[in-house]
Each structure stands twice: as C-alpha cells, then as structure tokens.
C-alpha cells in the first residue's frame, strides 16, 4: 500500500537538494519563517509536478490551449496525485464580477428563473409556471392570446443579453461631478476658477465666456445664478473674440464656439483613448448608481419573470443565508409535474451554497461586487469552488488559507479540510496560524532562516513531536510557552493624551451608522469576524474621509463628519505586489540603486572610462546587457510547448554587459566590487560592504530593521510575498518624524511566522516612536495583544455585524462578554 509521496533532490528556488516523505490521505502542514522555502516545496515541487504530469497525459492539441507548467528542478517525485492549488492572493476581479458569478451560484439561480418562473407576455400578463419552457415550446397567454417564447437562462445574464441598456450591465454610470467643476469659488474665472477649462480645454474659453455675458473678473461665488448657469450649462454659440497671447506679443481675432463646463468634461470623456487620458478626465467624474436598473445590472425584461413572488434582482439582494431558505420552498410552490425538475435545479444550488455557508460567507448577497470583497472572502470563494465537486484522490495545496480569517471562522475551514481527507484526498497546508496547524496530522518545518539560509527541513513529525523538539521554531508557539507580549501598552487614562481622530458615518454595505474615535500616536487594531465591516470602516470610510479632509475636497457621501486636527498625511500600506514587470527590483524600489550609480560614477575606473551615473542603469544605460535589454532573462517561443523563460545566456541573469564588471568600487576595508556583483549580494552582506557610504548604508539599515536582510538587491519585486512587499513599502517611511501621519495597514501579519510577527511589532514601534498614528486591520492574536487600543466590530458578519461591539485596551475587550474576539485573547 503506497501511503506517502517521495520527493528526492528538490532544488526549486532556495531548497537545498532536500529529500522528504509526505504522507498521503492526511492533512500535512508545512511551517517555517517567511522566505524559508515553504511555498517552494508546496507549490514549486508538489503542485508543479502533480499538475504537469496530469496535463502531459492529454493530447498535444488540448495542451496547446492550456497554460503549461515547466518541469520543476527536482531529481524525482514519486506517487504524486493530480494536484489543485489555491494561491495566497486571488487576483482582484473586474467590475463585471459579483459574488454570484464568482461562486457560480447565479448560474443555478438563472436556470430556476428561466425554467420555473411565471413569465410575462408582451402585453404585461403573467402566465403560471409550465413545462413548455423546458421543452422549448411557444407560450400562449390565456388572457390575450399572445404568442411568445420564455427567456433562456442566457437572456437573464447581465454579462450578455440580459444587461441593462443604460449601464451595459455594470450597475453604475459615470456622470459629471458638479462639485469638482469649480473647486474654489473664491477665484475669478480669469484666475482659473473653472477647473476643466484649465486642464481639458484651451484657456481661450474664458474669453468666449466673457463674450457670453459673464463677468470673468469677480470671484465666482459673487456671480448671479444666471451667470453661473451659463458657465455650467450655457448653449454652444459661436462668438467673435479678440485674443492676446500671454507669453508673446501676438494678438488676433477668432470665431470660437462656447463649450460650457459640463460639456467640456463630457466631450473629453467621449474622446478618451487610454489610461492617461482617463486620468485627466477622471477627477471631474463621479460614479452613480444606474438610474434605470438601480444597480441590479439587469434589463427590464430580465427583471420581469417572478418566482415565489419575487424577481431575479430581488433574489440577488438577499443574503446567501436567506436565499438558501427561500430556495428550499421553490419546488413546493410549483405544480406537481414540475417538481422533479425543480428539485434537481435547487439541489445543485444548495450543494454549492452549503460549502460557502460552512466557510462563513452566508452574510454576502449575490449582487455584491467581487472587487469590494476582502482577500479572505475571495480566497474562501475560490476554496469553495474547488471543493464542491466530491472528488477523490486529488492533492489540494492550500497556500495560507487562514488569511483574513477570524479565529472563530477557522473552525469552518478545518471542517472543509477534514471533509476533503474523508473523501480520500490529500491536503497540503502552508500556514503559520498555530490554531490551524494544530489540525494537521503531520508537520514539516522548513528553515532555519529565510532566503539563502533556508531551504532545509529542520523537523518533521506530529504536533506533539514538534512541541518536544528544541530545534523547532514554531514548537513553543504551538505549546503556548513563547512570550508574545512585546511592547508596553498605553493605559486607559493616557490613551487620548495626544488627541484623537473622530469619524461619524452613515450606513454603507452591511455597516450601520458609526461614531468612532482613534487615539493619535497610538497603535489601534481593528478586529472582528469576517464580514463584520472592518474593511468597509477603515478602507472605505476612514481613509477616504481623511484624504478628502487633507485635500480639502468633498467628503464621501456616507461620511457625516471627520475631525482630525494636525493630520496632514494618510498612508495605506497594503500587501498588493509591487510592480508588475521584472524591471523593478528591491534596490530600485528602495532607492538604493540610484545612490549606488552615483557612487560608481565617481570611482576612478568610471572617470577613466568616461562613464556617467546614467550609464549604470540596467534599464536604459549603456552598460546594460544587450542580449536581454537588462531584464536578466529571455523568452523562447517553442512550438507546442509553453514559452520558456531562461536566464539570459550573455549576462547570466546579472542584467549587465561585460564592461560593467570592469568598473570597481573600493570600500573602507579596500575590497573592490563591481555593481553587478554588488546587486547579487543580499542586504546584510551589502551593508557590511557599504559601511562608510552614508546614504546607502542608512537605506540598507532600514531594510535590515524591517526584517528584510535576506533579500538580494537584484531580486525582482513582483516575486516577493505579500508580507515582504508590505514591509518594503515602509522602507521610505521609517526614520522620518511622522507626528502628522496616519499609517493604515490591511492585515500586515499575512504570511508571517510568529517570529516574523515580532519583527513587525518592532516596525510599528519604530513608527510610533516617531510620533505616527498606526491603524491596523488584523486577526493575529499576538498583534491584538500588543495593541494600545482595540476596536472590535461585529458581533457577527453581514447583517448581524456592522457595529462597534467594544473599544478599549485588550484587557477590556477580553472582559466584554459580547465580543467574539475577546474569547480568543
């Protein structure tokens, strides 16, 4: 009986030629600090081999139509089943994607409405449900005798024939934002009061406006209503004007047509061809709910069929919990002969919905736009989609499924994993969350450190084995012996000593009207179960309100007021990847590369050969490698095989031509190194080399403080993990005085080992020491314990959430019986 997969000689990324046996039909956890090679083993070896072997069994013709995985660098992998992976960061879907389309629940629902609903004849009469629809026969109205066909499921889809004509199925329309046309009404029209004429139109428009009878030399607020109306909505008349050019002595006369302010924007919008043009127009537009479909995205015809008395758009506005109850009553509401068909359609709906409910997504409505969901919600949508077919003998690789999950939601996730194993599948789980790792039957711990010092298996065994072995780094956290409280927290009395930020909001999504206070100069953590409104409150209310206040623009519609004395900057540090192409590296992003280029240009070698700082750029300089244009890799197009990206044969991945190796820089210890060699060092080694070079060593030191000492300077930023990207974005902020800044972090502990969380807390402390106000959305209990002030949202998700349950120190939250978070602290 084969009961384990055998991996021999794995060398993917930083794996050090490791041999490991992985039990089959079990939950196997892979743990280790960030960058220790967990994902390399799980995704780079097991998933890559499992999916590649399965695809290789298909014909060339079929394979040509699929994205293909290249062979992993491993000597052999035996007994690996066909594999499915759930990645750490599902991409953010487009405007057309909703919770209903993403989970494919809407497919079953549309089918119900097409086959089982009561349809409307062209004259407006409703016909009782009939089997004739499924048979594809013509329907006849019993009242007026009209003949017509019922809509198919496709005609009820807002991404095809069922789309609302006005908004094209997106549910929102762009209209001119009147408030943005004259942002400052103390200016005169000559002084540039009408913003679109300054940026989208010739400045001559002010002269034409004067000819239309508007005074252009008085402040805009002193104009009569009639004059303002001409500015906003005046007719397109031709006027004869004299003009005098501002910067030369030329003058002349012209016939010119008047474009009012609103038409100027509409005309520019109609001519937009690219993103750059859109950016110029965008600031004069606002998104409004479509007036015809009221945001439901469906045409009037698609909203016509009724089932159990409600239309499709009304069904999509129900939460999943309510909808499941409603669907249960559908077969009983139909004539006897239609029930078997109804039951099979409803069953398909219920089985998909059950998984989503298990994962705690019952509070979402089907019409919720998928781009407004949090990372954790999108990831669980993806998980539910993968596990709803009761397969057997498949390897599921889950990359950090606990992201965005409150401790109370993890229970549903562990249930799904145990179900998969019970069906005869194997689950590989890459995670740091001790609560979810405790569910694993076997744990493999990678390490001992990150990057080049990682890639070894330090310990493997059951949870009890890890707790007992002293070399295990996660063992103390599993057994609860590790010290997790790292900083002194402010007491209740001194909490608002530096002042506070007050926010008052109306209701939005599932969040009820809120009154909220955030202490300045403290670490505030916003907690709550998934769907309790943390993202909505912080990212859609607090951040836009602060931005509006700082820029002096109008507050978002659902914000009543914001009071924030002395705040001049708000910085959102999220975990989205940095850059999309291979040209962005750690050194360029952290501003180290520019400084190094200046240093190299001053070196004796460079002066002798006549190189300037610009020559040392691997993107545009003369010293970049001509073979790959400075990207370090070349793409080969091979018929019938996937495009192969290989390391550039000329520069071997260094991005520089041979001449660059001839220019060396000498440090204090009289070691000489060329720029391509320096770019191959990690931050720690580079810091040792650049000891006496002030600016460079300061910037490298910052990266080291952020716990990124193991990254190589030439590493491309898109390949960094979420947690690494987030800390790299902070590099430019550490060390400055930040008393006027608010930093907002969205789940920064994502992908962080308990030891890395301690590094993160030190980073927060560095910001607080400089006077910053830090607001964090977080589930990690170690981060919550170290907060000065906790705002707990809830008590549940969706309709049963959306208010502040408790606010205070972590101790006060723990004693609050209503708070679900408090139970786990």
Q: What feature does the model see in each segment?
A:
Residues 1-825:
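Conserved phosphate-binding elements of NTP-dependent enzyme cores
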């Amino acid at each position: 009986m084969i009961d384990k997969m055998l991996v021999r000689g794995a060398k993917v990324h930083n794996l050090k030629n490791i041999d490991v046996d992985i039990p089959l039909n079990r939950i196997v956890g892979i743990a280790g600090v960030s960058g220790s090679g967990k994902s390399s083993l799980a995704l780079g070896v097991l998933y890559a081999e499992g999916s590649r072997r399965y695809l290789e069994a298909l014909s060339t013709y079929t394979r040509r139509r699929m994205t293909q995985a290249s062979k992993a660098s491993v000597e052999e992998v035996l007994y690996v089943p066909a594999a499915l992976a759930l990645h750490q960061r599902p991409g953010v879907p487009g405007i057309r994607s909703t919770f209903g389309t993403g989970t494919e629940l809407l497919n079953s629902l549309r089918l119900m409405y097409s086959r089982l609903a009561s349809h409307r004849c062209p004259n407006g009469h409703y016909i009782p449900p009939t089997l004739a629809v499924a048979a594809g026969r013509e329907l006849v109205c019993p009242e007026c005798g009209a003949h017509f066909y019922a809509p198919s499921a496709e005609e009820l889809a807002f991404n095809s024939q069922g789309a609302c004509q006005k908004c094209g199925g997106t549910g929102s329309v762009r209209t001119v934002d009147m408030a943005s046309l004259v942002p400052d009404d103390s200016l005169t029209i000559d002084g540039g009061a009408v913003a679109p004429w300054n940026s989208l139109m010739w400045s001559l428009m002010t002269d034409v406006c004067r000819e239309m009878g508007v005074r252009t030399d008085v402040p805009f607020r002193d104009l009569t209503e009639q004059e303002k109306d001409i500015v906003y909505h005046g007719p397109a008349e031709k006027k004869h004007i004299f003009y005098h050019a501002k910067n030369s002595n030329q003058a002349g006369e012209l016939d010119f047509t008047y474009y009012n302010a609103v038409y100027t924007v509409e005309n520019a919008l109609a001519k937009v061809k690219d993103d750059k043009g859109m950016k110029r127009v965008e600031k004069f537009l606002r998104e409004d709910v479509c007036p015809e479909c009221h945001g439901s995205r469906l045409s009037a015809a698609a909203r016509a069929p009724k089932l159990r008395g409600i239309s499709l758009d009304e069904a999509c506005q129900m939460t999943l919990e309510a909808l499941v109850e409603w669907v249960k009553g559908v077969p009983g509401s139909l004539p006897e002969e239609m029930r078997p068909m109804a039951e099979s359609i409803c069953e398909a709906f219920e089985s998909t919905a059950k998984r989503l409910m298990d994962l705690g997504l019952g509070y979402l409505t089907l019409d919720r736009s998928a781009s407004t969901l949090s990372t954790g919600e999108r990831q669980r949508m993806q998980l539910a989609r993968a596990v709803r077919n009761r397969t057997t003998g498949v390897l599921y690789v889950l990359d950090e499924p606990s992201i965005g999950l409150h401790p109370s939601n993890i229970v549903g996730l562990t249930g799904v994993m145990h179900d998969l194993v019970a069906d005869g599948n194997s689950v590989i789980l890459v995670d740091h969350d001790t609560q979810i790792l405790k569910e694993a039957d076997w744990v493999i711990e990678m390490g001992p450190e990150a990057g080049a010092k990682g890639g070894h298996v330090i310990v493997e065994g059951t949870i009890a084995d890890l707790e007992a072995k002293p070399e295990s780094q996660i063992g103390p956290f599993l057994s609860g012996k590790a010290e997790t409280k790292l900083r002194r927290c402010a007491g209740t009395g001194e909490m608002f000593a530096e002042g506070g930020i007050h926010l008052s909001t109306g209701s939005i999504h599932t969040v009820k009207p809120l009154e909220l206070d955030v202490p300045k100069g403290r670490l505030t953590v916003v907690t709550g179960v998934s769907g309790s409104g943390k993202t909505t409150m912080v990212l859609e209310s607090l951040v836009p309100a602060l931005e509006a206040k700082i820029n002096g623009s109008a507050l978002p519609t659902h914000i009543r007021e914001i009071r924030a004395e002395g705040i001049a900057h708000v910085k959102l540090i999220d975990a989205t990847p940095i850059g999309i192409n291979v040209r962005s590296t750690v050194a360029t992003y952290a501003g180290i590369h520019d400084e190094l280029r200046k240093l190299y240009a001053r070196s004796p070698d460079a002066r002798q050969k006549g190189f300037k700082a610009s020559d040392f750029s691997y993107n545009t300089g003369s010293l970049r490698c001509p073979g790959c244009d400075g990207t370090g890799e070349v793409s080969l197009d091979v018929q019938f095989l996937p495009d192969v990206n290989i390391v550039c044969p000329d520069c071997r991945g260094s991005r520089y031509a041979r001449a660059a190796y001839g220019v060396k820089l000498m440090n204090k210890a009289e070691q000489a190194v060329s720029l391509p060699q320096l770019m191959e060092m990690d931050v720690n080694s580079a810091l040792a080399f650049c000891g006496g070079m002030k600016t460079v060593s300061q910037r490298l030191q910052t990266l080291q403080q952020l716990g990124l000492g193991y990254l190589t300077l030439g590493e491309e930023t898109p390949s960094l993990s979420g947690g690494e990207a987030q800390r790299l974005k902070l590099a430019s902020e550490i060390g400055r005085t930040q008393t006027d800044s608010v930093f907002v972090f969205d789940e920064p502990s994502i992908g962080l080992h308990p030891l890395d969380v301690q590094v993160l807390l030190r980073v927060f402390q560095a910001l607080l020491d400089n006077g910053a106000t830090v607001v964090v959305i977080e589930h990690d209990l170690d981060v919550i314990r170290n907060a000065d002030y906790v705002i707990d949202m809830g008590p549940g998700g969706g309709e049963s959430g959306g208010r502040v349950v408790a606010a205070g120190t972590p101790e006060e939250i723990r004693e609050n019986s209503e708070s679900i978070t408090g139970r786990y602290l």
